[in-house]
Amino acid sequence: MTFPKKLAVLALAGLALQCGAAFAQKGETVKIAWIDPLSGLMAPIGQNQLKSFQYIAELFNKNNPAGVKFEIVPFDNKVSPAESLTALKSATDQNIRYVTQGDGSGSAGALVDAINKNNERNPGKEVLFMNYAAVDPDLTNSKCSYWHFRLDADTSMKMEALTTFIKDQKDIKKVYIIGQNYAHGVQVAKYAKADLARKRPDIQVVGEDLHPLAKVTDFAPYVAKIKASGADTVITGNWGSDLSLLVKAANEAGLDVKFFTYYANNSGTPTALGPGAAGRIYFVGYGHPNMGGQIGKLQADFKAKFNDDFYVADIYAELQLLSEAMAKAKSTDPVKVAAALEGLRLKSYNGDIEMRKTDHQLQQDLWISVWQKTDAKNPYSVENTGYTFAPVAHYDAYVASTPTSCQMKHGV
């Protein structure tokens, strides 16, 4: 073989190797352990989320920038940190390197600790945690981890948006705070009091209650205390049965006050709200049911397939970010994907989003919506009630963004 021919062959071989590396991840199956409740009082929430993950995975498997296939592997954690750790052990035993969880910051905190230890002790078998709904601010502050990425806005960000809205509602004078007795509920109360004192010092906090998570079946005693306090407004971070049963008890007692919530759109709560709650129930989130466009089409298709609402939309952002990061890293290795996720910016269903490098907290726009009858502008019937959540305020990412004290070590 002549020297020029040799060079040509070597060049082609090098190009082939480069192309192979560029698409090394293409066709790979990426298993994601979904660790959340499928039994107990919070089962309806978990069942909706699992369906949503499987639906979005199927959508991305048809087309994503990394050319990978996502497979969601469910584990029932019964909203228990201990059960979450058992599920994580089972997942790692099956060589599953991606974990997603959201229902309960207690479980999220336990997973972060265990994943940190696993990744330190088992180089080459690192696990990456995508948190889609556990919103304790400590997870991206004092307890931040290189291996943890949060898709939802945290408690402090949501409260920043809620209190920015409340500030201009001059009829609000007396507030009662009720929450679940774990990290999230405690943080909601803390930030509500601090933000109200800063923005509306004239508002009185006339009562505060914490109750066990997913254990209370009758909220009548709590509602009686709210009524007796003279509150005109309730702030709550409750979710699942703890919100739907609270609202049910409030309706039965004729408690005619405003509720500012984080999760009034979650399974079961809209049905519990009913017509009597119209104009009084607000929720803050990274979207709402009447956004239309791409996410509107997904909602309609999901409802046609399952007769259920697709409301945990950051699941879409999660797989969008993961597939973009895998394409960027040219790998499905969690070590390389974590590095590619840091600082990643893209356009999602709710506008421009950015995975902030300093603490792995997603930066995104937030909306406040109110419960009302469907109309031409807001046509999506939530849980087939004839009612919907209509947007009343929209805040750009920078408005609700909060600073971080995170001091994580970046990279391995």
What is each residue range found by the language model?
Residues 1-31, 93, 405, 409-412:
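Short, low-complexity disordered leader/linker segments with a strong preference
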Residues 29, 44-51, 63-139, 151, ...:
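Beta-alpha junction/loop-to-helix N-cap segments that form part of ligand/metal-binding clefts
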Residues 29-52, 75-82, 103-104, 178-187, ...:
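Extracytoplasmic "Venus flytrap"
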Residues 30, 345, 349-412:
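Solvent-exposed, acidic/polar segments of extracytosolic/periplasmic ligand-binding ectodomains
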Residues 42-66, 191-198:
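Short, polar/charged alpha-helical segment
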Residues 83-86, 137-138, 146-254, 287-297:
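Extracellular/periplasmic Venus flytrap/periplasmic-binding protein
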Residues 91-105, 122-132, 174-179, 230-240, ...:
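Periplasmic-binding protein-like
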Residues 145, 247-319, 327-332, 384-411:
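Extracellular/periplasmic periplasmic-binding protein-like sensory domains
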